[in-house]
C-alpha cells in the first residue's frame, strides 16, 4: 500500500480541487476514483453523484434543524419552569418587619443552639411543649438565609430547607435562587436558656464572617444558566422577604402542622444545591450527616449527628463515609435541664436532606414508610451531657424499627439521676483529660467502622482527647478546628481536624475506644453484657464499606475481615470481646492486599489544649493485649502506638511466612498431581499413536498426479507433526491452567475431543471414520519438552490462521465439485420456476388446477431436498466425508482428463459426406432437444433410422418416403413442439419429472394470463 504521507497529500489535493471548482467533481465521480486502496487497487468506487450528494446534505440539514428545535424547546421548557417557580415564590405574603429586632436579640442564643435539633440523642427530663419545639424547628429552617451582620454569629453551611408551614419553598427554589447553603441557621430559643457568649471557631475552612449576601447566588453554578442574573435578582428579593418573615415568627410559638411527606419530597430535589455547597465548613463543631439512603428516621441520625447535651458538650466532628457535605455547624450551649426541647420535624427535614444527598440511591425504599413526628416523640429520652459519636455505615439491624430502638436504648440510657448537668461535666476533664462524653456509643455498627476497628476502637472516638481524626471523610473534606469556650467549664480547645484522606483504614492511637468513666453509672439500666453481645454479634456479621464506593450501603466491600481482626472494647467492662486468634489470622491472610492500600493516619494526642498529628506506619494493631485501661490509653503517647504497631508488624511477618509455606505446599501438591495426570495422558497418546500408524497404511496411497493432492499431503505433514504436540500440550494445559500459557492448549483440548468437523485443520480426520489421514511420524520419546511453553500466544495465533486458511480452501474446493454444482443449479432452477409460476398464476384464488398445484409441490420438494443436501454437506458431515467428496471429484476429473488425452492422441479419420451430414443432423437434433425428458428415446431412434435408411437411398423409393424414412418430417414436427415447449421447460430443471402434458397445459394457459 502507499505511504501514509503520500495518501494524505493526495487526499488534501483532491479536497482542495473539489473546493475550488464543483464542476471538477463530476469527472472524478465518473472515473470512480476511490480513496480506499488495497494493494494499490482502488476499491469501493463512489456511488454518489452530485444530485444524490445534494439530497444527502439536505437530509442532514433537516436532521440538524430538528435537533436544534428540540434543544430550543427544551431550554424554553426549563426557563418557563423556573419562571413558574419564581412566580410561586413571589405570590407569598411578606411578613412585617416589626419583630426583626427581637430576632437580632436572640441571635446569640440561636447561634449557640444551631445544631441542637440535629442531635438524635435526647436531653434531660423536662421537655418544653410541642409548641416550643415546633417553633424552634420552623425557625431552624427559616433562619438559613439571614445576612451575617453579626461577626460573632455562627456561620453554618448546609441545606436551605427554609420552608414555612404552607410549604412555600418549591423543590426547585434551592436550585434556582442559589441560596442552597444556609448562612445563619439558628434557633430563637423561646424557653429560658443560660446566656452564653458566642463561640468563635478558627477552623481553616470556616466561612468568612464578612461574607456578603450576594455571594449566595455566585457560589453554586446555576443549572439554568440563561436566567442567572434574573435568578440572582429574584433570590435577593426572596431573601429580603424571608428576613422579615423570620423576624415575625421569631417570637411566635405555634404548632407546625406541616406535611412531612411534602418536606421529604422537597428535600430530595434540593440535593444538587447541597452537593455543590458541601465543601464549605461551619465555624464550630461540624456534625456531618452521613450520606446514607436509609436514614429515614430521626434516631437513625445517630450515625450522623454529634449530640448536643444540656451540659457543656464539646463539639464533636462526626464524619462519615462518602460524606461530602458538612450539613450543619454550631456550638453547644450550657442549658438548664428544662431548657431543652424535643427533636421532631428537623429530623424529618434532616432525613430528607440525607435522602437528597444519596444521589441515584435517593429513591430506594425506606425501612419505615412513616415520617410522623410521633415516631420521634416516643423515642425522645433524656440524656445527660453526652457526645454520642457513631461511626457509620449503619448495619442492617439498625434499619429496622426494633434495631433502631435498641440502638437508641444503648445510647440513651435512663439518666434521671444524672440530669444535673453541672455535676456531671466537671468530672469528665479530670478523668479523661478533656471534656469527653459521658457515654460513648457502642452500637450494632461497631464492626462497620471503615478504619478497621483497632484494639479497642469499637466505633468510638473520644472527642475529649481531641483525637477524633475521622478518616472516613473523603473528597477533600474540611478541616475544622472548633474552639469551644464555655462560661462554666473553662477553655477546652478541641482541634478536631477532619483531613481529606482517600481511604484510611488505619485508626489513631488515641482514638481507640476510650470509654468514659461515667458510662457505667450513666447507663446503669443497660448491662454491659448487652453491649458486649451487640459488639460481638456485629463484629461477626456485618461488613464495612469502601470509602471510594458511591454508596456505603449498596456498594459493600469485603472489609469485614479487617474489622474483625481486632477485638472490640466493651465500654461497660473496659475489656475486649473474645475473638479467637485463628479467626484473626484467617482474616489477616485475606487482607494482605488491603494493607498495602492503607494510608498513614494521624494520631491525635490526648492533651487537653493541643492536638498532635503523628504518622503511623502502614500496619495495623495486633491482636495482642487483651485488656486496655481507659486512663492508660489516654495517658500513653505515640510510644505505645509504635509498640503496638511493631507487634502488629511481627504478626504480619508471621502471617506472610505462613502464607509462603502454604503456597509452597500447594504448589508441590499441584506439581505432583500434574505429573500423575501427564503420565496418564502419555499412555493415551501412545495408544492413539499406534492406531494412527495402523491407519496410515490405508491412506498413504493417495494419488500424487493432482495439484490438490499435493496440497492435502502438505496438510497431512503438518497434521502429523502437530498432532502429538497438540496432545502433549493438552496434557500440560490440564496442569498449567493457572498460568497464562494455557490458552491455546485449552482450545486444542476442546477441539480434539469434539466432533472432527469443528476441529482445527491439524486435527481433521482424527475421528475413527475410515478415511483418517493423520499419522504421527515422530517417536514419543522426543516429546519431553513442556509443550505448554512452546505453544505461546504467538504460535497459537499462527495455528489459528493456518486453520482458517485450510478451512477456507476446502470450503471453496467443495463448492467447485460436481455434486455441489448440481445442487446449486437445482436450487437456482427450482426457485426460478417457482417464481415464474407464481407470477403466471391467476390473480384470483381458487383457479389453480390440481395438476398445477401438485407440480408446484413437487418442485418445492425438490428445492427443499437440494437445500438440505447442501446443509448436510457443510454442517452435518464430518471432515472425513467432506474429504471423500473431494476425493471422488478428483477421480472423476482425472478420468475426464484421461479420456480427453486419449482422444487427442487418436488420429482423426476422414469422413465421407454422408457421415458428415449424419453427424450434423445429430448435432442439430441435440441442440433442439436440450432440456427434453425424452432425450434417450431420440438418441436411440436416430442411429437406427439412419442405419435402416442408408441402403435404400439409391433405390426406387419415392422421395417423400425416403424423407419420411430419414426422419426429416418427424424431426421438423418435433422441433416445432420442442420450440413451443421450450419456455416452460426452461423453468423446469432436468431432474424434474415433468411430462409434456403439463408443459403443454402451462403453454396453453399463457395467452389467457396475458389477456387477463
Swiss-Prot record:
It is found in: Cytoplasm, Cytoskeleton, Microtubule organizing center, Centrosome, Centriole; Cytoplasm, Cytoskeleton, Microtubule organizing center, Centrosome; Cytoplasm, Cytoskeleton, Cilium basal body. Induction: Up-regulated during the transition from G1 to S phase of the cell cycle. The highest levels are observed in S phase, after which the levels decrease markedly. GO terms for biological process: centriole replication; centrosome duplication; ciliary basal body organization; negative regulation of cilium assembly; positive regulation of cilium assembly; regulation of cytokinesis. Residues 1-223 are annotated as: CEP97 binding. Residues 978-988 have a biased composition (Polar residues). Phosphorylated by CDKs. Keywords: Cell projection, Cilium, Cilium biogenesis/degradation, Coiled coil, Cytoplasm, Cytoskeleton, Phosphoprotein, Ubl conjugation. It holds the Pfam family CaM_bind. Residues 350-565 are annotated as: Interaction with CEP76. The modification Phosphothreonine is found at residue 194. It comes from the Eukaryota. GO terms for cellular component: centriole; centrosome; cilium; cytosol; protein-containing complex. Residues 64-82, 781-821, 909-924 are annotated as: Calmodulin-binding. The modification Phosphoserine is found at residues 170, 366, 372, 400, 551. Interacts with CALM1, CETN2, CEP76, CEP104, CEP290 and TALPID3. Interacts with CEP97. Seems to associate with discrete CETN2, CEP97 and CEP290-containing complexes. Interacts with NEURL4 and CCNF; these interactions are not mutually exclusive and both lead to CCP110 ubiquitination and proteasome-dependent degradation. Via its interaction with NEURL4, may indirectly interact with HERC2. Interacts with KIF24, leading to its recruitment to centrioles. Interacts with USP20 and USP33. Interacts with MPHOSPH9. Necessary for centrosome duplication at different stages of procentriole formation. Acts as a key negative regulator of ciliogenesis in collaboration with CEP97 by capping the mother centriole thereby preventing cilia formation. Also involved in promoting ciliogenesis. May play a role in the assembly of the mother centriole subdistal appendages (SDA) thereby effecting the fusion of recycling endosomes to basal bodies during cilia formation. Required for correct spindle formation and has a role in regulating cytokinesis and genome stability via cooperation with CALM1 and CETN2. PANTHER family: CENTRIOLAR COILED-COIL PROTEIN OF 110 KDA (PTHR13594:SF1). This is Centriolar coiled-coil protein of 110 kDa. It comes from Homo sapiens (Human).
Amino acid at each position: 500500500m502507499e505511504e501514509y504521507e503520500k495518501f494524505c497529500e493526495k487526499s488534501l489535493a483532491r479536497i482542495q480541487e473539489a473546493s475550488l471548482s464543483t464542476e471538477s467533481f463530476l469527472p472524478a465521480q465518473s472515473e470512480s476514483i476511490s480513496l480506499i486502496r488495497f494493494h494499490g487497487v482502488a476499491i469501493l468506487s463512489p456511488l454518489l453523484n452530485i444530485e444524490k450528494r445534494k439530497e444527502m446534505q439536505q437530509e442532514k440539514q433537516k436532521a440538524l434543524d430538528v435537533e436544534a428545535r428540540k434543544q430550543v424547546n427544551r431550554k424554553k421548557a426549563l426557563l418557563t419552569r423556573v419562571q413558574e417557580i419564581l412566580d410561586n415564590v413571589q405570590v407569598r405574603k411578606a411578613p412585617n418587619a416589626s419583630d426583626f429586632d427581637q430576632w437580632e436579640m436572640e441571635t446569640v442564643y440561636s447561634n449557640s443552639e444551631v445544631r441542637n435539633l440535629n442531635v438524635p440523642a435526647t436531653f434531660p427530663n423536662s421537655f418544653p411543649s410541642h409548641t416550643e419545639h415546633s417553633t424552634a424547628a420552623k425557625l431552624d429552617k427559616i433562619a438559613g438565609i439571614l445576612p451575617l451582620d453579626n461577626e460573632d454569629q455562627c456561620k453554618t453551611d448546609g441545606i436551605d430547607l427554609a420552608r414555612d408551614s404552607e410549604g412555600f419553598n418549591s423543590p426547585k427554589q434551592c436550585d434556582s435562587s442559589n441560596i442552597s447553603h444556609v448562612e445563619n441557621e439558628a434557633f430563637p430559643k423561646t424557653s429560658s436558656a443560660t446566656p452564653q457568649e458566642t463561640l468563635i471557631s478558627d477552623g481553616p475552612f470556616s466561612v468568612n464572617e464578612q461574607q456578603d449576601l450576594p455571594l449566595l447566588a455566585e457560589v453554586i453554578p446555576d443549572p439554568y444558566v440563561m436566567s442567572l442574573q434574573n435568578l440572582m435578582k429574584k433570590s435577593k428579593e426572596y431573601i429580603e422577604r424571608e428576613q422579615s418573615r423570620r423576624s415575625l415568627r421569631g417570637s411566635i410559638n405555634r404548632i407546625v402542622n406541616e406535611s412531612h411527606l411534602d418536606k421529604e419530597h422537597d428535600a430530595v430535589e434540593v440535593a444538587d444545591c447541597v452537593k455543590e455547597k458541601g465543601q464549605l465548613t461551619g465555624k464550630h463543631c461540624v456534625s456531618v450527616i452521613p450520606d446514607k439512603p436509609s436514614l429515614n428516621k430521626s434516631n437513625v441520625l445517630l450515625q450522623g449527628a454529634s449530640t448536643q447535651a444540656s451540659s457543656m458538650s464539646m463539639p464533636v466532628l462526626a464524619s462519615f463515609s462518602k460524606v461530602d457535605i458538612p450539613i450543619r455547624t454550631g456550638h453547644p450551649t450550657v442549658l438548664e435541664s428544662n431548657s431543652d426541647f424535643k427533636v421532631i420535624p428537623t429530623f424529618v427535614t434532616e432525613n430528607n436532606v440525607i435522602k437528597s444527598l444519596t444521589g441515584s440511591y435517593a429513591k430506594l425504599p425506606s425501612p419505615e414508610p412513616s415520617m410522623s413526628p410521633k415516631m420521634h416523640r416516643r423515642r425522645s429520652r433524656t440524656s445527660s451531657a453526652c457526645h454520642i459519636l457513631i461511626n457509620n455505615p449503619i448495619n442492617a439491624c439498625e434499619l429496622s424499627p426494633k434495631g433502631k430502638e435498641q440502638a437508641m436504648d444503648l445510647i440513651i440510657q435512663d439518666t434521671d439521676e444524672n440530669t444535673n448537668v453541672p455535676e456531671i461535666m466537671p468530672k469528665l476533664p479530670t478523668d479523661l483529660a478533656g471534656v469527653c462524653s459521658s457515654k460513648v456509643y457502642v452500637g450494632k455498627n461497631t464492626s462497620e467502622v471503615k478504619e478497621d476497628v483497632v484494639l479497642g476502637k469499637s466505633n468510638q472516638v473520644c472527642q475529649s482527647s481531641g483525637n477524633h481524626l475521622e478518616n472516613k471523610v473523603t473528597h477533600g473534606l474540611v478541616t475544622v478546628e472548633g474552639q469551644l469556650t464555655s462560661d462554666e467549664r473553662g477553655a477546652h480547645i478541641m482541634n478536631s481536624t477532619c483531613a481529606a484522606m482517600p481511604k484510611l483504614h488505619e485508626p489513631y492511637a488515641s482514638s481507640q475506644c476510650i470509654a468514659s468513666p461515667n458510662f457505667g453509672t450513666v447507663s446503669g439500666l443497660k448491662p454491659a453484657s448487652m453491649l458486649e453481645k451487640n459488639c460481638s454479634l456485629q463484629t461477626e456479621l456485618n461488613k464495612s464499606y469502601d470509602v471510594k464506593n458511591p454508596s456505603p450501603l449498596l456498594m459493600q466491600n469485603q472489609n469485614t475481615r479487617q474489622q474483625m481482626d481486632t477485638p472490640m472494647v466493651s465500654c461497660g467492662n473496659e475489656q475486649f470481646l473474645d475473638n479467637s486468634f485463628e479467626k484473626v489470622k484467617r482474616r489477616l491472610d485475606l487482607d494482605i492486599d488491603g494493607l498495602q492500600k492503607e494510608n498513614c493516619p494521624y494520631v491525635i494526642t490526648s492533651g487537653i489544649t493541643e492536638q498532635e498529628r503523628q504518622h503511623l506506619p502502614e500496619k495495623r494493631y495486633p491482636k495482642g493485649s487483651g485488656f486496655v485501661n481507659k486512663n492508660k490509653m489516654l495517658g500513653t503517647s505515640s510510644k505505645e502506638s509504635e509498640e503496638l504497631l511493631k507487634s502488629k508488624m511481627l504478626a504480619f511477618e508471621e502471617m506472610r511466612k505462613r502464607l509462603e509455606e502454604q503456597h509452597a505446599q500447594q504448589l508441590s501438591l499441584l506439581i505432583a498431581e500434574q505429573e500423575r495426570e501427564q503420565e496418564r495422558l502419555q499412555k493415551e497418546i501412545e495408544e492413539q499413536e499406534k492406531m494412527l500408524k495402523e491407519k496410515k497404511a490405508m491412506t498413504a496411497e493417495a494419488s500424487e498426479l493432482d495439484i490438490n493432492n499435493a496440497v492435502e499431503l502438505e496438510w497431512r505433514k503438518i497434521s502429523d507433526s502437530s498432532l502429538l504436540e497438540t496432545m502433549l500440550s493438552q496434557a500440560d494445559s490440564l496442569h498449567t491452567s493457572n498460568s497464562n500459557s494455557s490458552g491455546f492448549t485449552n482450545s486444542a483440548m476442546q477441539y480434539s475431543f469434539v466432533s472432527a468437523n469443528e476441529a482445527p485443520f491439524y486435527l481433521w480426520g482424527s475421528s475413527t471414520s475410515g478415511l483418517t489421514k493423520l499419522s504421527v511420524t515422530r517417536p514419543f520419546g522426543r516429546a519431553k519438552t513442556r509443550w505448554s511453553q512452546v505453544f505461546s500466544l504467538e504460535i497459537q495465533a499462527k495455528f489459528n490462521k493456518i486453520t482458517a486458511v485450510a478451512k477456507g480452501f476446502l470450503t471453496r474446493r467443495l463448492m467447485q465439485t460436481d455434486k455441489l454444482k448440481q445442487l446449486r443449479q437445482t436450487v437456482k432452477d427450482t426457485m426460478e420456476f417457482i417464481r415464474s409460476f407464481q407470477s403466471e398464476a391467476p390473480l384470483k384464488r381458487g383457479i389453480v388446477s390440481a395438476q398445477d398445484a401438485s407440480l408446484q409441490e413437487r418442485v418445492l420438494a425438490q428445492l427443499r431436498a437440494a437445500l438440505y443436501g447442501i446443509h448436510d454437506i457443510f454442517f452435518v458431515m464430518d471432515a472425513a466425508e467432506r474429504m471423500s467428496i473431494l476425493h471422488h471429484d478428483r477421480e472423476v476429473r482425472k478420468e475426464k482428463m484421461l479420456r480427453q488425452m486419449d482422444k487427442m492422441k487418436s488420429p482423426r479419420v476422414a469422413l465421407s459426406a454422408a457421415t458428415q451430414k449424419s453427424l450434423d443432423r445429430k448435432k442439430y437434433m441435440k441442440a433442439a432437444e436440450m432440456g427434453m425428458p425424452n432425450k434417450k428415446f431420440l438418441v436411440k431412434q436416430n442411429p437406427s433410422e439412419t442405419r435402416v435408411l442408408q441402403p435404400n437411398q439409391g433405390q426406387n423409393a419415392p422421395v417423400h418416403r425416403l424423407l419420411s424414412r430419414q426422419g426429416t418430417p418427424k424431426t421438423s414436427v418435433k422441433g416445432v413442439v420442442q420450440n413451443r415447449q421450450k419456455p416452460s421447460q426452461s423453468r423446469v430443471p432436468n431432474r424434474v419429472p415433468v411430462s409434456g402434458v403439463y408443459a403443454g397445459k402451462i403453454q396453453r394457459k399463457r395467452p389467457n394470463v396475458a389477456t387477463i
